[in-house]
Amino acid sequence: EIRENPQADRVPRVFLFGAKAAPGYAVAKRIIRLINSLAAEINADPICRDRLQVVFLENYRVSLAEHLMPASEVSQQISTAGKEASGTGNMKFMMNGALTVGTLDGANVEMHERLGDENMFLFGLHADEVVRLKREGYAPQKLYARDENLRAVIDKLKAGFSDGVSYDDLASRLLMNDEYMLLQDFASYCAAEQRMADTYARSEEWNRMSLINIARSGIFAADRA
Protein backbone atom coordinates (compact mmCIF):
# COMPACT_ATOMS: atom_id res chain seq x y z
CA GLU A 1 0.00 0.00 0.00
CA ILE A 2 2.86 2.41 0.74
CA ARG A 3 4.40 1.79 -2.68
CA GLU A 4 1.05 2.14 -4.45
CA ASN A 5 0.13 5.37 -2.67
CA PRO A 6 3.29 6.93 -1.20
CA GLN A 7 1.67 10.34 -0.62
CA ALA A 8 -1.02 8.99 1.72
CA ASP A 9 -0.95 10.25 5.30
CA ARG A 10 0.27 7.33 7.43
CA VAL A 11 1.62 6.97 10.93
CA PRO A 12 5.27 5.84 10.59
CA ARG A 13 5.97 2.52 12.31
CA VAL A 14 8.92 0.40 13.37
CA PHE A 15 8.13 -3.27 13.96
CA LEU A 16 10.52 -4.91 16.44
CA PHE A 17 10.61 -8.72 16.50
CA GLY A 18 12.34 -10.50 19.36
CA ALA A 19 12.30 -14.30 19.29
CA LYS A 20 14.20 -17.55 19.49
CA ALA A 21 13.55 -20.88 17.77
CA ALA A 22 14.16 -24.27 19.34
CA PRO A 23 16.87 -26.24 17.46
CA GLY A 24 14.38 -28.66 15.91
CA TYR A 25 11.58 -26.18 15.16
CA ALA A 26 12.05 -25.80 11.41
CA VAL A 27 8.97 -23.62 10.79
CA ALA A 28 10.01 -21.14 13.48
CA LYS A 29 13.46 -20.88 11.89
CA ARG A 30 11.85 -20.19 8.51
CA ILE A 31 9.67 -17.46 10.03
CA ILE A 32 12.75 -15.79 11.53
CA ARG A 33 14.39 -15.97 8.10
CA LEU A 34 11.25 -14.41 6.61
CA ILE A 35 11.38 -11.52 9.08
CA ASN A 36 14.96 -10.82 8.04
CA SER A 37 14.06 -11.01 4.34
CA LEU A 38 11.26 -8.51 4.95
CA ALA A 39 13.60 -6.23 6.87
CA ALA A 40 16.21 -6.27 4.11
CA GLU A 41 13.69 -5.35 1.42
CA ILE A 42 11.63 -2.78 3.34
CA ASN A 43 14.51 -0.98 5.04
CA ALA A 44 16.33 -0.53 1.72
CA ASP A 45 13.27 0.73 -0.16
CA PRO A 46 13.48 4.54 -0.61
CA ILE A 47 9.67 4.81 -0.64
CA CYS A 48 8.97 2.63 2.40
CA ARG A 49 11.88 3.14 4.74
CA ASP A 50 10.81 6.53 6.10
CA ARG A 51 7.32 5.20 6.88
CA LEU A 52 7.94 1.57 7.80
CA GLN A 53 10.90 -0.35 9.18
CA VAL A 54 11.35 -3.93 10.38
CA VAL A 55 14.01 -4.96 12.90
CA PHE A 56 14.77 -8.46 14.18
CA LEU A 57 16.42 -8.44 17.60
CA GLU A 58 18.76 -11.41 17.93
CA ASN A 59 19.16 -13.47 21.09
CA TYR A 60 16.03 -12.11 22.77
CA ARG A 61 16.49 -12.29 26.55
CA VAL A 62 15.55 -10.56 29.80
CA SER A 63 18.29 -7.93 29.59
CA LEU A 64 17.12 -6.97 26.09
CA ALA A 65 13.47 -6.91 27.19
CA GLU A 66 14.42 -4.48 29.96
CA HIS A 67 15.32 -1.94 27.25
CA LEU A 68 12.58 -2.88 24.80
CA MET A 69 9.52 -2.79 27.04
CA PRO A 70 9.89 0.78 28.38
CA ALA A 71 10.54 2.04 24.84
CA SER A 72 7.56 0.36 23.13
CA GLU A 73 4.33 2.19 22.42
CA VAL A 74 2.45 -0.85 21.09
CA SER A 75 2.49 -4.45 22.28
CA GLN A 76 1.49 -7.10 19.73
CA GLN A 77 -0.02 -10.10 21.53
CA ILE A 78 -1.52 -11.96 18.61
CA SER A 79 -1.67 -15.67 19.41
CA THR A 80 -4.74 -17.54 18.18
CA ALA A 81 -7.38 -17.74 20.91
CA GLY A 82 -7.02 -20.93 22.91
CA LYS A 83 -3.45 -21.61 21.76
CA GLU A 84 -1.24 -19.57 24.10
CA ALA A 85 -0.10 -20.44 27.61
CA SER A 86 -0.69 -17.49 29.93
CA GLY A 87 2.56 -15.52 30.11
CA THR A 88 3.51 -12.22 31.69
CA GLY A 89 5.27 -10.32 28.90
CA ASN A 90 2.07 -8.57 27.85
CA MET A 91 1.54 -7.38 31.43
CA LYS A 92 5.05 -5.92 31.54
CA PHE A 93 4.33 -3.94 28.37
CA MET A 94 1.06 -2.78 29.95
CA MET A 95 2.87 -1.58 33.09
CA ASN A 96 5.19 0.48 30.90
CA GLY A 97 2.29 2.16 29.09
CA ALA A 98 2.27 0.26 25.79
CA LEU A 99 -1.18 -0.33 24.29
CA THR A 100 -2.05 -3.85 23.24
CA VAL A 101 -3.09 -5.09 19.81
CA GLY A 102 -4.22 -8.60 20.61
CA THR A 103 -6.60 -11.51 20.71
CA LEU A 104 -8.61 -12.68 23.71
CA ASP A 105 -6.08 -15.35 24.58
CA GLY A 106 -3.79 -16.14 27.49
CA ALA A 107 -3.21 -13.29 29.93
CA ASN A 108 -4.83 -10.87 27.47
CA VAL A 109 -8.12 -12.12 28.89
CA GLU A 110 -7.15 -11.00 32.40
CA MET A 111 -5.93 -7.65 31.08
CA HIS A 112 -9.18 -7.18 29.19
CA GLU A 113 -11.13 -7.70 32.41
CA ARG A 114 -9.31 -4.65 33.82
CA LEU A 115 -9.19 -2.51 30.68
CA GLY A 116 -12.32 -3.26 28.67
CA ASP A 117 -12.62 -3.04 24.90
CA GLU A 118 -12.02 0.71 24.98
CA ASN A 119 -8.41 0.52 26.20
CA MET A 120 -7.13 -2.29 23.96
CA PHE A 121 -7.24 -3.01 20.23
CA LEU A 122 -8.82 -6.46 20.12
CA PHE A 123 -9.23 -8.61 17.03
CA GLY A 124 -9.76 -12.18 15.96
CA LEU A 125 -11.81 -15.21 16.87
CA HIS A 126 -12.67 -16.11 20.44
CA ALA A 127 -11.65 -19.56 21.71
CA ASP A 128 -15.16 -21.00 21.31
CA GLU A 129 -15.35 -19.64 17.76
CA VAL A 130 -12.06 -21.35 16.90
CA VAL A 131 -13.44 -24.68 18.11
CA ARG A 132 -16.73 -24.21 16.26
CA LEU A 133 -15.07 -23.21 12.98
CA LYS A 134 -12.76 -26.22 13.08
CA ARG A 135 -15.72 -28.48 13.76
CA GLU A 136 -17.81 -27.01 10.94
CA GLY A 137 -14.91 -26.97 8.49
CA TYR A 138 -12.26 -24.33 7.83
CA ALA A 139 -11.15 -23.63 4.25
CA PRO A 140 -8.35 -21.03 4.12
CA GLN A 141 -8.25 -21.26 0.31
CA LYS A 142 -11.67 -19.55 0.17
CA LEU A 143 -10.34 -16.62 2.18
CA TYR A 144 -7.36 -16.38 -0.16
CA ALA A 145 -9.67 -16.32 -3.18
CA ARG A 146 -11.92 -13.52 -1.96
CA ASP A 147 -9.58 -11.20 0.00
CA GLU A 148 -7.39 -9.13 -2.33
CA ASN A 149 -5.06 -7.90 0.41
CA LEU A 150 -4.57 -11.38 1.84
CA ARG A 151 -3.93 -12.77 -1.63
CA ALA A 152 -1.22 -10.16 -2.21
CA VAL A 153 0.54 -11.19 1.01
CA ILE A 154 0.46 -14.91 0.18
CA ASP A 155 1.57 -14.28 -3.41
CA LYS A 156 4.50 -12.22 -2.12
CA LEU A 157 5.61 -15.15 0.04
CA LYS A 158 5.55 -17.34 -3.06
CA ALA A 159 7.39 -14.82 -5.24
CA GLY A 160 10.14 -14.12 -2.72
CA PHE A 161 12.05 -11.02 -1.70
CA SER A 162 15.00 -8.93 -2.81
CA ASP A 163 17.43 -11.35 -1.17
CA GLY A 164 16.29 -14.05 -3.60
CA VAL A 165 14.61 -16.20 -0.96
CA SER A 166 11.11 -17.57 -1.60
CA TYR A 167 8.76 -18.77 1.12
CA ASP A 168 6.48 -20.96 -0.95
CA ASP A 169 6.64 -23.58 1.81
CA LEU A 170 5.11 -21.17 4.34
CA ALA A 171 2.50 -20.01 1.82
CA SER A 172 1.48 -23.61 1.14
CA ARG A 173 1.30 -24.32 4.84
CA LEU A 174 -1.09 -21.39 5.32
CA LEU A 175 -3.29 -22.37 2.40
CA MET A 176 -3.42 -26.12 3.05
CA ASN A 177 -3.03 -26.46 6.83
CA ASP A 178 -3.62 -23.14 8.56
CA GLU A 179 -3.59 -24.70 12.02
CA TYR A 180 -3.62 -21.35 13.81
CA MET A 181 -6.31 -19.83 11.57
CA LEU A 182 -4.08 -16.91 10.65
CA LEU A 183 -5.92 -16.27 7.41
CA GLN A 184 -9.26 -16.19 9.23
CA ASP A 185 -7.99 -13.50 11.61
CA PHE A 186 -6.13 -11.49 8.93
CA ALA A 187 -8.86 -8.97 8.04
CA SER A 188 -9.74 -8.43 11.69
CA TYR A 189 -6.06 -7.84 12.51
CA CYS A 190 -5.74 -5.26 9.72
CA ALA A 191 -8.80 -3.44 11.06
CA ALA A 192 -7.31 -3.41 14.57
CA GLU A 193 -4.05 -2.01 13.22
CA GLN A 194 -5.99 0.78 11.50
CA ARG A 195 -7.89 1.60 14.70
CA MET A 196 -4.59 1.71 16.55
CA ALA A 197 -3.03 4.05 13.95
CA ASP A 198 -6.08 6.33 13.99
CA THR A 199 -5.94 6.53 17.78
CA TYR A 200 -2.20 7.23 17.78
CA ALA A 201 -2.86 10.28 15.61
CA ARG A 202 -5.04 11.64 18.44
CA SER A 203 -2.26 12.09 20.98
CA GLU A 204 -4.42 13.14 23.92
CA GLU A 205 -6.62 10.06 23.59
CA TRP A 206 -3.58 7.81 23.16
CA ASN A 207 -1.87 9.21 26.25
CA ARG A 208 -5.06 8.81 28.29
CA MET A 209 -5.30 5.14 27.28
CA SER A 210 -1.63 4.63 28.09
CA LEU A 211 -2.08 6.07 31.58
CA ILE A 212 -5.15 3.88 32.16
CA ASN A 213 -3.09 0.82 31.21
CA ILE A 214 -0.39 1.80 33.69
CA ALA A 215 -2.87 2.58 36.47
CA ARG A 216 -4.80 -0.66 36.09
CA SER A 217 -1.72 -2.90 35.86
CA GLY A 218 -1.09 -2.82 39.60
CA ILE A 219 -3.03 -6.01 40.20
CA PHE A 220 -0.42 -7.87 38.14
CA ALA A 221 2.57 -6.54 40.12
CA ALA A 222 4.89 -9.00 41.85
CA ASP A 223 4.51 -6.93 45.05
CA ARG A 224 0.85 -7.92 45.23
CA ALA A 225 1.67 -11.62 44.87
Model-derived segments and spans:
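Histidine-centered catalytic/metal-binding microenvironments
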Residues: 3-7, 17-19, 204, 210-212, ...
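Generic recognition of short, well-ordered alpha-helical segments
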Residues: 29-33, 88, 224
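Loop/helix-junction capping segments adjacent to catalytic residues or to phosphate/diphosphate-binding pockets
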Residues: 25, 62, 83-84, 223
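Short catalytic-loop micro-motif centered on adjacent basic/acidic residues
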Residues: 55, 76-77
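Long, K/E/R/D-enriched contiguous segments that form extended
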Residues: 1-65
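Catalytic binding pocket for nucleotide-activated donors in carbohydrate/polymer assembly enzymes
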Residues: 70-72, 78-220
